[in-house]
């Protein structure tokens, strides 16, 4: 018996509204069976013409004595049909599937793509491989001793079982809008790259995850750079491809800067070492163990209460809260908030937090961590942690996969994710929301203000290392409605040129996305 595999159709990946993000295209595999060939010259002539191949390459395979020789895979179906219609003995045209991405580069670093064998390589394609892959079928044909098929015995078929479909929380319209917004700010600010995350802070569903520049999923082995890549070695090329495929929202860490003051604020309020009415004085710096740590405003903010300190994003205020907490307590909240373990997002290669060891953390380290410097976290970790601090204190798992559907689209299994209740009290969570609403209404985040709806948020501008290079990461984290958040957005701009303040360049990006959500009346994201 001779066996030929029939590939199973891979399951589709769908967005929240059922739009197809990853699909299959029928392609053909052309093979020759040596023992059945009657007119080799005709076969060589037809195949070289139709497949646009060198006759010699085909001759080698046609003349090779073997049970079956593949000539070409991934042949367009129309070409396969033409070849089949010649009725050439010894030529087999088998139909097969190739992955196809209708939206090109949309959410490329989330969806991922498949290799030549149709197996997932990165992204959701590899994370949900077992669900999507299906089971191959086979064709068994009976042959005589010379390997010639005995026609009258026919063939036995085991039909392939198609893969199941994965429904995700991604929203194509939101993803497209956010990707355009990211491209726009990247071009305007001549930035190196821009990431945007949009998620539901109540349940962890991710609506959009943008990392520009993205790449074309239908052509994932072509670099997305303008530079001439002709002179690269194979290793350099592979390194650049790996870099292009990375998802910086979870594969890479960064120094968050002032968006991290939300964590210090929540810990200080929960522990009771600070209240909203506490007064602080900022002369433009704070002395910690004989070291002068500056405020962004060198002339100082003068006298202010805690809410004003947050509105001004004043470093000395948050250093003071960090020092009042002390290393042991600060570390306790770090653990309690889930910052020292990974978020568990359903994509491969999530990076962990890079933090000072507790025993190496002195007052100076504590002071810098309190306002978001001297350590690194992933954007997804920041978004998930802040979500958990503003939703009433429930630690959620950020995720894309929502349910697994049968290939015919029928019944599905809902995917479940862990959540941990009570990482802070409802009361502290409410105070954090109120303070962050003030930051947008009257403080450093006012460029995210929207008429008619309360938005909460926090800006950040951090210098990358070495500090002397004067390169910055500008970001803004916002959520709405402030009193009962249904959507949280994080925009991170790497290495912007010119004006680099997060409140000036990143806050308007989140505002434009929030306005887009509000204007799309058919979307009920923001109303519970």
Labelled PLM ranges:
Residues 410-415, 507-528:
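Short, gly/Ser/Thr-rich active-site loops of penicillin-recognizing serine hydrolases
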Residues 22, 144-155, 201-259, 263-495, ...:
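Beta-lactam-recognizing serine transpeptidase/beta-lactamase-like catalytic domain environment
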Residues 46-54, 61, 82-90, 94, ...:
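Structured segments of extracytoplasmic/periplasmic soluble domains
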Residues 68, 151-199:
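Conserved, well-ordered alpha-helix/loop/beta-strand core segments that scaffold catalytic motifs
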Residues 5-9, 136, 190-193:
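Short, small/polar residue-rich loop motifs at catalytic or cofactor-binding pockets
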Residues 6, 13-22, 178, 196-207:
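Short, glycine-anchored, charge-dense loop/turn motifs used at functional sites
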Residues 4-52:
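Juxtamembrane extramembrane loops of integral membrane proteins
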Residues 42-49, 63-163, 491, 508-511:
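Small/polar-residue-rich segments within soluble enzyme cores
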